[in-house]
Amino acid sequence: CRQRRHQPDGVFPKNMFSLDVGIDLGTSSPLVYIKGMGIILAEPSVVAIQASTKKPLAVGSEAKRMLGRTPGSIVAIRPMKDGVIADFEVTQKMLEYFIKKARSLARTLPWSKIRVVVSVPSGITEVEKRAVVESAEQAGADKTFLIDEPMAAAIGAGLPVTEPGGSMIIDIGGGTTEVAVISLGGIVVCISERTAGDKMDEAIVQHIKRKYNLLIGERTAEAIKIKIGSADELSEEKRMEIKGRDLVAGLPRTVTITSEEIRA
């Protein structure tokens, strides 16, 4: 990655007639922040649409509950993949939902300008960056700024990013893992790998299928990762009871798994 400079103490220029919104457009769980109000929305990156018209029916938590349960006429999809836009049109609909929500909560003047800063993986291409900007602006943003995710994560973690000493940040998201060294307000070096939390969930699904002949969904896999997953050995190993569909009998079945096998 090339070295880039940011203005961490003031991403937006001061303007009293604007609504300043920050969006972490994550692969699995976007966050929406309003200046002066804090985080106002944290929902899954899922949109339920009418298959024939692509008309959005639900966004976020409501749409995620439809995953795997929708009739053929309704499709619940993730418009982001590996940290970048996989479906431009649906991402735009999701951003429209975020921006409308921000405007309604902030109760801004009708003519107030909406300025949005979006965090993006440091390794994406100029074409992918342009897709993010165009999606945000077509969704209603008057001005869109981009910031690299490692820099945004470092600022959020309170690291001294403007000082001459180096600070390392490891940001594991749903679609990308990024490791960066930051100094003097810029990213000195970074590595972006499109392997992260979603790949872990997929690995858990495959493990349960191979070992127990049991099919589980992505929500169950994510719950396993969060509840009993670990990188190092635990002083006391954990156990968890899960339910799935037996691949032979086709009936629901319950098994107990351990943190040790998930870690392995």
What are these regions (language model features)?
Residues C1-I172, A180-A264:
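Nucleotide/phosphate-binding catalytic cleft detector across ATP-hydrolyzing
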